[in-house]
UniProtKB/Swiss-Prot annotation:
It is a peripheral membrane protein. The keyword Signal does not apply. This is Spermidine/putrescine import ATP-binding protein PotA. Keywords: ATP-binding, Cell inner membrane, Cell membrane, Membrane, Nucleotide-binding, Translocase, Transport. Part of the ABC transporter complex PotABCD involved in spermidine/putrescine import. Responsible for energy coupling to the transport system.
Length: 379
């Protein structure tokens, strides 16, 4: 790159958008920092694409404000904003070559032929398509077509690049490779990336921060670590990755060291109480959602011994073992009838005894520090 492009800071302030009686975006507020790789993550129909279209200028909000670098762009047409969009469908001109597709927006700006040539070759090199400049879109693979679409969106050097689920039409391996390339492009250009996806692994692997949406609302904004390890609502806990969640009632709350609190929870589905640490005190009697990730649960054929840290131990049997490459997934039915999911590397890699098999009686356990309590119960 000749020089790093200055990305835009984007602020969405109390933005709402309805289609008839359907509220697609409900008072969304988020500040996207200059040069950030920011993902908007949520299930189909949650409003994330509508929000992206509002940023792009394809839709106008019913209320609220939208600013680029602290200047409102409401009423400013899509072609006048410092943003470009990469669509899921690529939207390439089938009769134009790779070179001509990328050059098209520069020609609309009436730049000189020399500058167009220089800029197109620069971005062709950036997306590793130097050898394909004379090919038509139908002569390219899906991944190559998507690279052309990305180069065309970047060649005008916008302040914001909007990516509307750009990888969803590609196979898993190609998605993984292009995701790495997108992250590299972001680092090389300095442009603000706003990435729309329903795929949690995509968002977690490349984002500086993530906004999780559901039913038109932004439920949580945070780093990938915060979203995964410290979910703000039970929906976020269940939607991001896989987890075991149980509605619970706080029985007691005791202050412990390191400014933490030890909670005792009554969990009807498990038919007993369990312990979990929390950063903040929670009043006894409060209904909460307890969650523990499958990879944080230990599974064994023998009952665990006593430990210095409080340990939650349950007995059950393996209802279904699932081979998943480097690890196994176990669905364990506890004595209460509840099902708990456990992830563990294969026993042969761990060298900790015989493989656990279907119908084996097992013990599942986790430390009080490995669970998490969510106070905001949405679902």
């Amino acid at each position: 790159m000749r020089q790093t492009v200055k990305g835009c800071a984007v602020t969405i302030d109390q933005v709402s958008k309805a289609y008839g009686h359907c509220l697609a975006v409900d008072r969304a507020t988020v500040h996207i920092r200059q040069g950030e790789f920011f993902s908007i993550l949520g299930p189909s129909g949650c409003g994330k694409t509508t929000l992206l279209r509002i940023i792009a200028g394809f839709e106008q909000p019913d209320s609220g404000d939208l600013t680029f670098d602290h200047v409102s762009v409401l009423g400013v047409g899509a072609n006048k904003r410092r943003s470009n969009t990469v669509f899921q469908s690529y939207a390439l001109f089938p009769h134009l070559s790779v070179y001509e597709n990328i050059a098209f927006p520069l020609r609309l700006k009436r730049l000189s032929k020399n500058l167009i040539r220089e800029r197109v070759h620069e971005y062709l090199h950036l997306v590793q398509l130097d050898e394909h400049l004379h090919k038509k879109p139908h002569q390219l693979s899906g991944g190559q077509q998507q690279r052309v679409a990305i180069a065309r969106a970047l060649v005008c050097e916008p302040g914001v690049l909007l990516l509307d689920e750009p990888l969803s039409a590609l196979d898993a391996k190609l998605r993984s490779n292009l995701l790495i390339e997108l992250d590299t492009l972001h680092d090389q250009t300095g442009i603000t990336f706003v990435f729309i996806t329903h795929d949690q692994s995509e968002a977690l692997s490349v984002s500086d921060r993530i906004a999780v949406m559901n039913k038109g609302k932004i439920l949580q904004i945070g780093t990938p670590y915060e979203i995964y390890e410290q979910p703000a609502t039970d929906f976020v806990a269940k939607f991001i990755g896989e987890t075991n969640s149980f509605l619970s009632t706080v029985v007691s709350c005791t202050a412990i060291e390191n400014e933490e609190f030890m909670l005792s929870l009554q969990v009807p589905e498990l038919d007993r109480t369990l312990t979990v640490t929390a950063d903040n005190p929670i009043d006894p009697g409060r209904r909460v959602c307890f969650t523990v990730r499958p990879e944080k649960i230990h599974i064994s054929l023998e009952e665990p011994g006593t430990t210095s840290a409080p340990l939650n131990v349950f007995r059950g049997f393996v209802e279904e073992p699932v081979y998943a490459g480097f690890q196994s997934k176990f669905f364990v039915q506890l004595e209460s009838g509840a099902i708990i999911q456990v992830f563990q590397q294969h026993q042969k890699y761990l060298d900790t005894g015989p493989e656990i098999a279907w119908k084996d009686t097992v013990y599942v356990s986790w430390s009080a520090h490995d669970g998490y309590v969510v106070e905001d119960i949405e679902s």
